[in-house]
Protein backbone atom coordinates (compact mmCIF):
# COMPACT_ATOMS: atom_id res chain seq x y z
CA UNK A 1 0.00 0.00 0.00
CA UNK A 2 2.92 2.23 -0.37
CA UNK A 3 2.59 5.77 -1.49
CA UNK A 4 0.84 8.91 -0.37
CA UNK A 5 -2.08 8.21 -2.69
CA UNK A 6 -3.67 6.11 0.03
CA UNK A 7 -3.02 8.44 2.94
CA UNK A 8 -6.30 8.80 4.83
CA UNK A 9 -7.41 12.28 5.85
CA UNK A 10 -7.87 11.52 9.55
CA UNK A 11 -8.73 14.21 12.09
CA UNK A 12 -8.65 14.33 15.90
CA UNK A 13 -12.00 12.54 16.28
CA UNK A 14 -10.82 9.63 14.13
CA UNK A 15 -7.60 9.28 16.11
CA UNK A 16 -9.53 9.45 19.38
CA UNK A 17 -11.77 6.55 18.31
CA UNK A 18 -8.74 4.46 17.35
CA UNK A 19 -6.92 5.36 20.56
CA UNK A 20 -9.90 4.39 22.72
CA UNK A 21 -10.01 1.03 20.98
CA UNK A 22 -6.35 0.31 21.70
CA UNK A 23 -6.81 1.23 25.36
CA UNK A 24 -9.90 -0.99 25.62
CA UNK A 25 -8.15 -3.97 24.01
CA UNK A 26 -5.22 -3.75 26.41
CA UNK A 27 -7.62 -3.27 29.32
CA UNK A 28 -9.51 -6.45 28.42
CA UNK A 29 -6.22 -8.34 28.27
CA UNK A 30 -5.17 -7.17 31.72
CA UNK A 31 -8.65 -7.86 33.15
CA UNK A 32 -8.50 -11.43 31.82
CA UNK A 33 -5.18 -11.95 33.57
CA UNK A 34 -6.90 -12.17 36.95
CA UNK A 35 -8.63 -15.40 35.90
CA UNK A 36 -5.39 -17.14 34.90
CA UNK A 37 -4.18 -19.52 37.58
CA UNK A 38 -3.25 -22.62 35.56
CA UNK A 39 -2.03 -23.47 32.07
CA UNK A 40 -5.56 -24.63 31.15
CA UNK A 41 -6.82 -21.15 32.07
CA UNK A 42 -4.17 -19.59 29.81
CA UNK A 43 -4.54 -21.93 26.83
CA UNK A 44 -8.23 -22.96 26.98
CA UNK A 45 -9.91 -20.34 29.22
CA UNK A 46 -10.52 -23.04 31.82
CA UNK A 47 -13.24 -24.54 29.54
CA UNK A 48 -15.73 -22.14 31.12
CA UNK A 49 -17.14 -19.82 28.43
CA UNK A 50 -20.79 -19.65 27.26
CA UNK A 51 -21.74 -20.59 23.70
CA UNK A 52 -22.60 -17.07 22.54
CA UNK A 53 -19.14 -15.82 23.56
CA UNK A 54 -17.27 -18.70 21.93
CA UNK A 55 -19.54 -18.49 18.87
CA UNK A 56 -18.81 -14.82 18.24
CA UNK A 57 -15.11 -15.41 18.96
CA UNK A 58 -15.17 -18.30 16.48
CA UNK A 59 -16.36 -16.11 13.61
CA UNK A 60 -14.32 -13.10 14.73
CA UNK A 61 -11.11 -15.13 14.77
CA UNK A 62 -11.65 -15.68 11.05
CA UNK A 63 -12.41 -12.02 10.33
CA UNK A 64 -8.79 -11.22 9.66
CA UNK A 65 -6.91 -10.25 6.53
CA UNK A 66 -8.35 -13.26 4.70
CA UNK A 67 -11.87 -12.05 5.25
CA UNK A 68 -11.70 -8.28 4.96
CA UNK A 69 -8.88 -7.37 2.59
CA UNK A 70 -8.74 -10.74 0.80
CA UNK A 71 -12.46 -11.20 0.16
CA UNK A 72 -12.94 -7.59 -0.93
CA UNK A 73 -10.01 -8.07 -3.32
CA UNK A 74 -11.66 -11.23 -4.61
CA UNK A 75 -14.98 -9.44 -4.97
CA UNK A 76 -13.32 -6.88 -7.22
CA UNK A 77 -11.31 -9.47 -9.15
CA UNK A 78 -13.78 -12.37 -9.45
CA UNK A 79 -17.18 -10.82 -8.76
CA UNK A 80 -20.12 -12.55 -7.07
CA UNK A 81 -18.40 -15.93 -7.39
CA UNK A 82 -16.52 -14.93 -4.24
CA UNK A 83 -19.62 -15.83 -2.19
CA UNK A 84 -18.64 -19.49 -2.69
CA UNK A 85 -16.10 -18.98 0.08
CA UNK A 86 -18.98 -18.38 2.49
CA UNK A 87 -22.05 -20.33 1.44
CA UNK A 88 -20.42 -23.53 0.23
CA UNK A 89 -16.89 -22.90 1.47
CA UNK A 90 -17.65 -22.24 5.14
CA UNK A 91 -21.18 -22.79 6.47
CA UNK A 92 -21.56 -26.55 5.71
CA UNK A 93 -18.16 -27.29 7.24
CA UNK A 94 -18.91 -25.21 10.35
CA UNK A 95 -22.16 -27.12 10.82
CA UNK A 96 -20.39 -30.46 10.31
CA UNK A 97 -17.83 -29.51 12.95
CA UNK A 98 -20.55 -28.73 15.48
CA UNK A 99 -22.78 -31.73 14.82
CA UNK A 100 -20.30 -34.50 14.05
CA UNK A 101 -16.77 -33.66 15.16
CA UNK A 102 -17.05 -31.65 18.37
CA UNK A 103 -18.29 -34.68 20.34
CA UNK A 104 -14.95 -36.36 19.57
CA UNK A 105 -12.86 -33.27 20.28
CA UNK A 106 -14.60 -32.14 23.43
CA UNK A 107 -15.56 -35.60 24.68
CA UNK A 108 -12.01 -36.94 24.50
CA UNK A 109 -10.78 -33.91 26.53
CA UNK A 110 -7.94 -33.24 24.11
CA UNK A 111 -6.27 -29.85 24.40
CA UNK A 112 -5.49 -29.51 20.69
CA UNK A 113 -6.07 -31.06 17.26
CA UNK A 114 -2.57 -32.61 17.11
CA UNK A 115 -3.22 -34.26 20.48
CA UNK A 116 -6.26 -35.99 18.98
CA UNK A 117 -4.03 -37.37 16.21
CA UNK A 118 -1.61 -38.74 18.81
CA UNK A 119 -4.42 -40.63 20.51
CA UNK A 120 -5.95 -41.82 17.23
CA UNK A 121 -2.71 -42.73 15.44
CA UNK A 122 0.77 -42.37 16.95
CA UNK A 123 3.47 -39.94 18.03
CA UNK A 124 5.08 -39.49 14.58
CA UNK A 125 1.71 -38.40 13.12
CA UNK A 126 1.23 -36.12 16.10
CA UNK A 127 4.66 -34.50 15.74
CA UNK A 128 4.29 -34.02 11.98
CA UNK A 129 0.95 -32.26 12.41
CA UNK A 130 2.16 -30.18 15.37
CA UNK A 131 5.13 -28.88 13.39
CA UNK A 132 3.14 -28.22 10.20
CA UNK A 133 0.41 -26.45 12.18
CA UNK A 134 2.94 -24.27 13.99
CA UNK A 135 4.56 -23.28 10.68
CA UNK A 136 1.18 -22.53 9.10
CA UNK A 137 0.10 -20.34 12.00
CA UNK A 138 3.15 -18.09 11.93
CA UNK A 139 2.83 -17.76 8.14
CA UNK A 140 -0.85 -16.79 8.39
CA UNK A 141 -0.10 -14.51 11.36
CA UNK A 142 2.29 -12.74 9.02
CA UNK A 143 -0.55 -12.16 6.55
CA UNK A 144 -2.71 -10.54 9.22
CA UNK A 145 0.21 -8.50 10.52
CA UNK A 146 1.12 -7.34 7.02
CA UNK A 147 -2.46 -6.27 6.34
CA UNK A 148 -2.59 -4.41 9.67
CA UNK A 149 0.67 -2.66 8.81
CA UNK A 150 -0.68 -1.63 5.40
CA UNK A 151 -3.59 0.14 7.06
CA UNK A 152 -1.33 1.82 9.61
CA UNK A 153 1.03 2.88 6.84
CA UNK A 154 -1.82 4.45 4.88
CA UNK A 155 -3.24 5.98 8.05
CA UNK A 156 -0.09 7.50 9.50
CA UNK A 157 2.42 7.39 6.67
CA UNK A 158 4.72 5.16 8.72
CA UNK A 159 7.34 2.97 7.03
CA UNK A 160 5.97 -0.54 6.52
CA UNK A 161 8.50 -2.20 8.83
CA UNK A 162 7.68 0.19 11.68
CA UNK A 163 3.94 -0.33 11.27
CA UNK A 164 4.47 -4.11 11.36
CA UNK A 165 6.42 -3.91 14.62
CA UNK A 166 3.88 -1.61 16.32
CA UNK A 167 0.95 -3.85 15.35
CA UNK A 168 2.82 -6.91 16.60
CA UNK A 169 3.60 -5.35 19.97
CA UNK A 170 -0.06 -4.51 20.65
CA UNK A 171 -1.24 -8.06 19.87
CA UNK A 172 1.66 -9.48 21.87
CA UNK A 173 0.73 -7.44 24.93
CA UNK A 174 -2.85 -8.59 25.36
CA UNK A 175 -2.26 -12.26 24.52
CA UNK A 176 0.83 -12.61 26.71
CA UNK A 177 -1.01 -11.04 29.63
CA UNK A 178 -4.55 -12.38 29.15
CA UNK A 179 -4.02 -15.71 27.38
CA UNK A 180 -6.89 -17.23 25.41
CA UNK A 181 -9.51 -15.45 27.54
CA UNK A 182 -7.92 -12.12 26.65
CA UNK A 183 -7.99 -13.10 22.98
CA UNK A 184 -11.57 -14.41 23.03
CA UNK A 185 -13.18 -11.52 24.90
CA UNK A 186 -11.33 -9.11 22.64
CA UNK A 187 -12.60 -11.09 19.64
CA UNK A 188 -16.19 -10.60 20.80
CA UNK A 189 -15.54 -6.86 21.09
CA UNK A 190 -13.75 -6.88 17.75
CA UNK A 191 -16.68 -8.57 16.01
CA UNK A 192 -18.97 -5.63 16.75
CA UNK A 193 -16.25 -3.08 16.00
CA UNK A 194 -15.53 -4.74 12.65
CA UNK A 195 -19.18 -4.75 11.59
CA UNK A 196 -19.65 -1.14 12.72
CA UNK A 197 -16.60 -0.16 10.69
CA UNK A 198 -17.53 -1.97 7.47
CA UNK A 199 -21.28 -1.36 7.20
CA UNK A 200 -20.84 2.37 6.37
CA UNK A 201 -18.57 1.45 3.45
CA UNK A 202 -21.29 -0.75 1.96
CA UNK A 203 -24.14 1.67 2.62
CA UNK A 204 -22.40 4.84 1.39
CA UNK A 205 -20.93 2.95 -1.56
CA UNK A 206 -24.32 1.65 -2.66
CA UNK A 207 -25.79 5.14 -2.41
CA UNK A 208 -22.99 6.45 -4.61
CA UNK A 209 -23.55 3.88 -7.38
CA UNK A 210 -27.35 4.13 -7.35
CA UNK A 211 -28.30 1.25 -5.09
CA UNK A 212 -28.20 -2.47 -5.82
CA UNK A 213 -29.60 -2.05 -9.34
CA UNK A 214 -27.08 0.67 -10.11
CA UNK A 215 -24.25 -1.55 -8.87
CA UNK A 216 -25.44 -4.43 -11.04
CA UNK A 217 -25.58 -2.21 -14.12
CA UNK A 218 -22.10 -0.88 -13.41
CA UNK A 219 -20.67 -4.39 -12.96
CA UNK A 220 -22.19 -5.42 -16.30
CA UNK A 221 -20.33 -2.52 -17.90
CA UNK A 222 -17.06 -3.42 -16.15
CA UNK A 223 -14.36 -5.85 -17.28
CA UNK A 224 -16.17 -8.65 -15.43
CA UNK A 225 -19.35 -8.18 -17.44
CA UNK A 226 -22.53 -10.17 -16.77
CA UNK A 227 -20.43 -13.08 -15.46
CA UNK A 228 -19.45 -10.95 -12.47
CA UNK A 229 -23.02 -11.12 -11.17
CA UNK A 230 -23.42 -14.90 -11.07
CA UNK A 231 -22.13 -17.56 -8.70
CA UNK A 232 -22.74 -20.76 -10.68
CA UNK A 233 -23.51 -19.69 -14.24
CA UNK A 234 -20.56 -20.50 -16.49
CA UNK A 235 -18.98 -23.04 -14.15
CA UNK A 236 -19.66 -25.88 -16.59
CA UNK A 237 -16.26 -24.86 -17.95
CA UNK A 238 -13.39 -22.74 -16.66
CA UNK A 239 -14.46 -19.77 -18.79
CA UNK A 240 -15.63 -17.64 -15.87
CA UNK A 241 -14.08 -14.92 -13.68
CA UNK A 242 -12.82 -17.43 -11.10
CA UNK A 243 -11.38 -19.71 -13.79
CA UNK A 244 -12.79 -22.72 -11.94
CA UNK A 245 -15.04 -25.63 -12.95
CA UNK A 246 -17.98 -26.43 -10.68
CA UNK A 247 -16.27 -29.71 -9.75
CA UNK A 248 -13.26 -27.81 -8.43
CA UNK A 249 -15.55 -25.43 -6.53
CA UNK A 250 -17.63 -28.21 -4.96
CA UNK A 251 -14.90 -30.76 -4.25
CA UNK A 252 -11.77 -28.60 -3.94
CA UNK A 253 -13.26 -25.60 -2.12
CA UNK A 254 -16.59 -26.82 -0.74
CA UNK A 255 -15.26 -30.10 0.60
CA UNK A 256 -11.49 -30.40 0.98
CA UNK A 257 -10.35 -26.80 1.59
CA UNK A 258 -13.44 -25.80 3.54
CA UNK A 259 -13.72 -28.86 5.76
CA UNK A 260 -9.95 -28.95 6.12
CA UNK A 261 -9.90 -25.40 7.45
CA UNK A 262 -13.00 -25.29 9.63
CA UNK A 263 -12.88 -28.77 11.16
CA UNK A 264 -9.16 -29.30 11.78
CA UNK A 265 -7.67 -25.80 12.10
CA UNK A 266 -6.91 -25.54 15.80
CA UNK A 267 -6.95 -21.73 15.72
CA UNK A 268 -10.73 -22.08 15.20
CA UNK A 269 -11.41 -25.33 17.09
CA UNK A 270 -9.67 -23.87 20.16
CA UNK A 271 -12.57 -21.43 20.59
CA UNK A 272 -15.06 -24.28 20.82
CA UNK A 273 -12.83 -26.26 23.20
CA UNK A 274 -12.98 -23.32 25.62
CA UNK A 275 -16.79 -23.68 25.93
CA UNK A 276 -18.25 -24.62 29.30
CA UNK A 277 -19.92 -27.91 28.28
CA UNK A 278 -20.49 -30.26 25.35
CA UNK A 279 -23.65 -28.52 24.15
CA UNK A 280 -21.97 -25.11 24.15
CA UNK A 281 -18.97 -26.55 22.32
CA UNK A 282 -21.18 -28.09 19.62
CA UNK A 283 -23.20 -24.91 19.17
CA UNK A 284 -20.11 -22.69 18.94
CA UNK A 285 -19.36 -23.12 15.20
CA UNK A 286 -23.08 -23.29 14.36
CA UNK A 287 -23.81 -19.99 16.10
CA UNK A 288 -20.86 -18.56 14.15
CA UNK A 289 -22.38 -19.81 10.87
CA UNK A 290 -25.28 -17.34 11.05
CA UNK A 291 -23.25 -14.11 10.93
CA UNK A 292 -20.95 -15.86 8.44
CA UNK A 293 -23.88 -16.05 6.01
CA UNK A 294 -24.13 -12.26 5.97
CA UNK A 295 -20.45 -11.25 5.94
CA UNK A 296 -20.38 -10.99 2.09
CA UNK A 297 -22.47 -7.82 2.47
CA UNK A 298 -19.47 -6.06 4.02
CA UNK A 299 -16.69 -7.73 2.03
CA UNK A 300 -17.78 -8.91 -1.43
CA UNK A 301 -20.17 -6.01 -2.08
CA UNK A 302 -17.51 -3.37 -1.24
CA UNK A 303 -15.17 -5.22 -3.61
CA UNK A 304 -17.71 -4.80 -6.41
CA UNK A 305 -18.21 -1.15 -5.48
CA UNK A 306 -14.46 -0.60 -5.67
CA UNK A 307 -14.36 -2.31 -9.07
CA UNK A 308 -16.84 0.15 -10.56
CA UNK A 309 -15.78 3.33 -8.73
CA UNK A 310 -11.96 3.14 -8.53
CA UNK A 311 -10.45 3.68 -11.96
CA UNK A 312 -7.55 1.41 -12.78
CA UNK A 313 -8.15 -1.03 -9.92
CA UNK A 314 -6.41 -4.32 -10.58
CA UNK A 315 -2.87 -3.14 -11.31
CA UNK A 316 -0.01 -5.54 -10.64
CA UNK A 317 1.65 -3.14 -8.22
CA UNK A 318 1.26 0.28 -6.62
CA UNK A 319 -1.81 1.74 -4.94
CA UNK A 320 -4.33 0.15 -7.33
CA UNK A 321 -3.75 -3.54 -6.55
CA UNK A 322 -6.88 -5.49 -5.62
CA UNK A 323 -5.75 -5.75 -1.99
CA UNK A 324 -6.39 -2.02 -1.64
CA UNK A 325 -10.08 -2.16 -2.55
CA UNK A 326 -11.30 -1.49 1.00
CA UNK A 327 -8.74 1.21 1.92
CA UNK A 328 -9.41 3.01 -1.37
CA UNK A 329 -13.14 3.07 -0.62
CA UNK A 330 -12.45 4.38 2.88
CA UNK A 331 -10.39 7.19 1.40
CA UNK A 332 -12.97 8.09 -1.25
CA UNK A 333 -16.29 7.57 0.56
CA UNK A 334 -16.12 8.07 4.31
CA UNK A 335 -16.42 11.35 6.23
CA UNK A 336 -14.38 11.98 9.37
CA UNK A 337 -15.76 10.24 12.43
CA UNK A 338 -17.11 7.42 10.29
CA UNK A 339 -13.60 7.08 8.87
CA UNK A 340 -12.24 6.59 12.38
CA UNK A 341 -14.76 3.81 13.03
CA UNK A 342 -13.88 2.10 9.74
CA UNK A 343 -10.13 2.28 10.38
CA UNK A 344 -10.70 0.91 13.87
CA UNK A 345 -12.81 -1.91 12.41
CA UNK A 346 -10.04 -2.87 10.01
CA UNK A 347 -7.39 -2.73 12.71
CA UNK A 348 -9.65 -4.88 14.93
CA UNK A 349 -10.08 -7.47 12.19
CA UNK A 350 -6.37 -7.95 11.65
CA UNK A 351 -5.66 -8.07 15.36
CA UNK A 352 -8.38 -10.70 15.85
CA UNK A 353 -6.98 -12.83 13.05
CA UNK A 354 -3.42 -12.60 14.28
CA UNK A 355 -4.46 -13.27 17.88
CA UNK A 356 -6.16 -16.49 16.78
CA UNK A 357 -3.00 -17.62 15.00
CA UNK A 358 -0.73 -16.75 17.93
CA UNK A 359 -2.95 -18.32 20.61
CA UNK A 360 -3.21 -21.49 18.53
CA UNK A 361 0.55 -21.57 18.04
CA UNK A 362 1.41 -21.11 21.71
CA UNK A 363 -0.94 -23.93 22.77
CA UNK A 364 0.34 -26.43 20.21
CA UNK A 365 3.98 -25.52 20.78
CA UNK A 366 3.66 -25.85 24.56
CA UNK A 367 1.50 -28.98 24.80
CA UNK A 368 2.30 -30.83 21.58
CA UNK A 369 5.98 -30.06 21.07
CA UNK A 370 7.62 -28.85 24.29
CA UNK A 371 5.72 -30.97 26.82
CA UNK A 372 5.39 -34.03 24.58
CA UNK A 373 8.98 -34.23 23.34
CA UNK A 374 11.25 -32.14 25.56
CA UNK A 375 10.06 -31.55 29.15
CA UNK A 376 7.27 -33.99 29.96
CA UNK A 377 6.82 -33.84 33.73
CA UNK A 378 7.33 -30.22 34.65
CA UNK A 379 5.11 -28.10 36.89
CA UNK A 380 2.02 -26.34 35.58
CA UNK A 381 3.75 -23.02 36.23
CA UNK A 382 6.58 -24.10 33.93
CA UNK A 383 4.20 -24.70 31.01
CA UNK A 384 2.44 -21.41 31.67
CA UNK A 385 5.81 -19.66 31.39
CA UNK A 386 6.69 -21.57 28.22
CA UNK A 387 3.34 -20.56 26.72
CA UNK A 388 4.09 -16.90 27.26
CA UNK A 389 7.57 -17.29 25.78
CA UNK A 390 6.06 -19.12 22.79
CA UNK A 391 3.69 -16.19 22.32
CA UNK A 392 6.63 -13.81 22.05
CA UNK A 393 8.37 -16.19 19.65
CA UNK A 394 5.30 -16.49 17.42
CA UNK A 395 4.94 -12.73 17.16
CA UNK A 396 8.64 -12.25 16.36
CA UNK A 397 8.50 -14.90 13.63
CA UNK A 398 5.23 -13.39 12.40
CA UNK A 399 7.05 -10.11 11.85
CA UNK A 400 9.39 -11.94 9.49
CA UNK A 401 6.63 -13.80 7.63
CA UNK A 402 4.75 -10.53 7.14
CA UNK A 403 7.35 -9.64 4.54
CA UNK A 404 6.64 -12.91 2.69
CA UNK A 405 2.98 -11.90 2.43
CA UNK A 406 4.09 -8.54 1.03
CA UNK A 407 5.18 -10.33 -2.13
CA UNK A 408 1.61 -11.25 -3.14
CA UNK A 409 -0.67 -8.73 -4.91
CA UNK A 410 -3.73 -10.71 -3.72
CA UNK A 411 -3.17 -12.14 -0.23
CA UNK A 412 -6.27 -14.33 -0.60
CA UNK A 413 -4.42 -16.37 -3.24
CA UNK A 414 -1.48 -16.76 -0.85
CA UNK A 415 -3.69 -17.89 2.01
CA UNK A 416 -5.54 -20.42 -0.15
CA UNK A 417 -2.18 -21.85 -1.24
CA UNK A 418 -1.23 -22.26 2.43
CA UNK A 419 -4.55 -23.97 3.18
CA UNK A 420 -4.13 -26.43 0.30
CA UNK A 421 -0.67 -27.42 1.59
CA UNK A 422 -1.36 -27.56 5.34
CA UNK A 423 -5.09 -28.13 5.85
CA UNK A 424 -6.20 -30.41 3.01
CA UNK A 425 -3.87 -33.35 3.85
CA UNK A 426 -4.72 -33.02 7.54
CA UNK A 427 -8.45 -33.09 6.85
CA UNK A 428 -8.12 -36.19 4.67
CA UNK A 429 -6.14 -38.04 7.34
CA UNK A 430 -8.47 -36.84 10.07
CA UNK A 431 -11.81 -37.65 8.46
CA UNK A 432 -10.77 -41.07 7.15
CA UNK A 433 -9.26 -41.98 10.51
CA UNK A 434 -12.36 -40.83 12.36
CA UNK A 435 -14.81 -42.86 10.26
CA UNK A 436 -12.64 -45.87 9.35
CA UNK A 437 -11.52 -47.48 12.57
CA UNK A 438 -9.36 -50.03 10.70
CA UNK A 439 -6.98 -47.27 9.51
CA UNK A 440 -3.66 -47.94 11.21
CA UNK A 441 -1.24 -45.59 12.99
CA UNK A 442 1.39 -45.96 10.25
CA UNK A 443 -1.25 -45.33 7.59
CA UNK A 444 -2.09 -42.10 9.38
CA UNK A 445 1.51 -40.92 9.32
CA UNK A 446 2.28 -41.83 5.71
CA UNK A 447 -1.05 -40.47 4.48
CA UNK A 448 -0.49 -37.11 6.15
CA UNK A 449 3.10 -36.87 4.92
CA UNK A 450 2.26 -37.95 1.36
CA UNK A 451 -0.68 -35.56 1.08
CA UNK A 452 1.46 -32.65 2.26
CA UNK A 453 4.21 -33.51 -0.24
CA UNK A 454 1.74 -33.75 -3.15
CA UNK A 455 0.06 -30.43 -2.27
CA UNK A 456 3.45 -28.72 -1.96
CA UNK A 457 4.71 -30.23 -5.21
CA UNK A 458 1.58 -29.15 -7.07
CA UNK A 459 2.05 -25.57 -5.91
CA UNK A 460 5.77 -25.49 -6.75
CA UNK A 461 5.24 -27.05 -10.19
CA UNK A 462 2.55 -24.48 -10.93
CA UNK A 463 4.73 -21.58 -9.82
CA UNK A 464 7.63 -23.01 -11.83
CA UNK A 465 5.53 -23.11 -14.99
CA UNK A 466 5.69 -26.90 -15.31
CA UNK A 467 1.91 -27.29 -15.01
CA UNK A 468 -0.74 -24.66 -15.66
CA UNK A 469 -4.08 -23.60 -14.21
CA UNK A 470 -6.43 -20.77 -15.14
CA UNK A 471 -5.78 -18.93 -11.87
CA UNK A 472 -3.95 -19.20 -8.56
CA UNK A 473 -7.22 -20.13 -6.88
CA UNK A 474 -7.89 -22.96 -9.32
CA UNK A 475 -4.46 -24.35 -8.44
CA UNK A 476 -5.39 -24.22 -4.75
CA UNK A 477 -8.69 -26.03 -5.39
CA UNK A 478 -7.06 -28.83 -7.39
CA UNK A 479 -3.99 -28.99 -5.17
CA UNK A 480 -6.29 -29.58 -2.21
CA UNK A 481 -8.25 -32.22 -4.12
CA UNK A 482 -5.08 -34.06 -5.16
CA UNK A 483 -3.80 -33.97 -1.58
CA UNK A 484 -7.04 -35.49 -0.29
CA UNK A 485 -7.03 -38.19 -2.98
CA UNK A 486 -3.41 -39.01 -2.14
CA UNK A 487 -4.28 -39.40 1.53
CA UNK A 488 -7.12 -41.80 0.69
CA UNK A 489 -4.99 -43.91 -1.67
CA UNK A 490 -2.03 -44.15 0.72
CA UNK A 491 -4.34 -45.04 3.62
CA UNK A 492 -5.91 -47.81 1.55
CA UNK A 493 -2.48 -49.20 0.59
CA UNK A 494 -0.70 -48.99 3.95
CA UNK A 495 -3.57 -50.07 6.24
CA UNK A 496 -3.76 -53.75 5.11
CA UNK A 497 0.01 -54.05 5.56
CA UNK A 498 0.23 -52.72 9.12
CA UNK A 499 -1.34 -53.35 12.50
CA UNK A 500 -4.40 -51.32 13.66
CA UNK A 501 -5.18 -50.20 17.18
CA UNK A 502 -7.65 -52.21 19.25
CA UNK A 503 -11.24 -51.09 19.79
CA UNK A 504 -10.43 -50.34 23.43
CA UNK A 505 -7.68 -47.96 22.34
CA UNK A 506 -10.04 -46.20 19.92
CA UNK A 507 -13.06 -45.75 22.19
CA UNK A 508 -14.16 -42.13 22.11
CA UNK A 509 -11.92 -41.38 19.13
CA UNK A 510 -13.70 -42.93 16.13
CA UNK A 511 -17.26 -43.10 14.87
CA UNK A 512 -19.14 -46.08 16.26
CA UNK A 513 -16.86 -46.51 19.28
CA UNK A 514 -17.70 -43.33 21.16
CA UNK A 515 -19.21 -42.92 24.59
CA UNK A 516 -20.16 -39.41 23.52
CA UNK A 517 -23.67 -39.19 22.04
CA UNK A 518 -26.26 -36.58 21.29
CA UNK A 519 -27.74 -37.29 24.72
CA UNK A 520 -24.85 -35.41 26.30
CA UNK A 521 -26.70 -32.18 25.56
CA UNK A 522 -29.38 -33.10 28.07
CA UNK A 523 -26.75 -33.97 30.66
CA UNK A 524 -25.39 -30.45 30.25
CA UNK A 525 -28.80 -28.91 30.89
CA UNK A 526 -29.13 -27.74 27.29
CA UNK A 527 -31.82 -30.12 26.05
CA UNK A 528 -34.27 -27.41 24.88
CA UNK A 529 -35.28 -28.08 21.26
CA UNK A 530 -34.30 -24.60 20.09
CA UNK A 531 -30.74 -25.25 21.29
CA UNK A 532 -30.40 -28.46 19.31
CA UNK A 533 -27.14 -28.35 17.29
CA UNK A 534 -28.76 -30.49 14.58
CA UNK A 535 -31.75 -28.17 14.18
CA UNK A 536 -29.64 -25.00 14.24
CA UNK A 537 -27.19 -26.52 11.79
CA UNK A 538 -29.79 -27.70 9.29
CA UNK A 539 -31.41 -24.25 9.25
CA UNK A 540 -28.02 -22.61 8.58
CA UNK A 541 -27.30 -24.91 5.62
CA UNK A 542 -30.78 -24.32 4.16
CA UNK A 543 -30.28 -20.56 4.42
CA UNK A 544 -26.91 -20.86 2.66
CA UNK A 545 -28.61 -22.68 -0.23
CA UNK A 546 -31.42 -20.12 -0.40
CA UNK A 547 -28.96 -17.22 -0.50
CA UNK A 548 -27.64 -18.55 -3.82
CA UNK A 549 -30.99 -18.18 -5.60
CA UNK A 550 -30.77 -14.44 -6.46
CA UNK A 551 -27.19 -14.76 -7.77
CA UNK A 552 -27.22 -18.22 -9.33
Spans of model-derived segments:
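Membrane-embedded helix-loop-helix hairpins and adjacent transmembrane boundary segments
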Residues: 2-552
Amino acid sequence: MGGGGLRLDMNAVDYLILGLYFVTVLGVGFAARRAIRTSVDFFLSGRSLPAWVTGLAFVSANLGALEIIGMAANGAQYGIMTVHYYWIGAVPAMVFLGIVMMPFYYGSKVRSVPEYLRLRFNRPTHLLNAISFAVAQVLIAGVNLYALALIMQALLGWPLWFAIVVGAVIVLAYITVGGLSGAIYNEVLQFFVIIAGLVPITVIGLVKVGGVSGLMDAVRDSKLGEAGLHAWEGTGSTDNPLGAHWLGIVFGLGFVLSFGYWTTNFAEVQRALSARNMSAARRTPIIAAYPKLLIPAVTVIPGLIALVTVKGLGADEGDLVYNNAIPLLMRDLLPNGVLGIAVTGLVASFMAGMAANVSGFNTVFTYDIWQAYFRRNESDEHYLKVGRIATVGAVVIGIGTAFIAAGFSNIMNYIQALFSVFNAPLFGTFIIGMFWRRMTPLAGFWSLLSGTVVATATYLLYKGGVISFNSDLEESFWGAGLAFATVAVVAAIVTPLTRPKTDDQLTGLVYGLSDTTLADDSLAGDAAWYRSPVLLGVVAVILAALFYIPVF
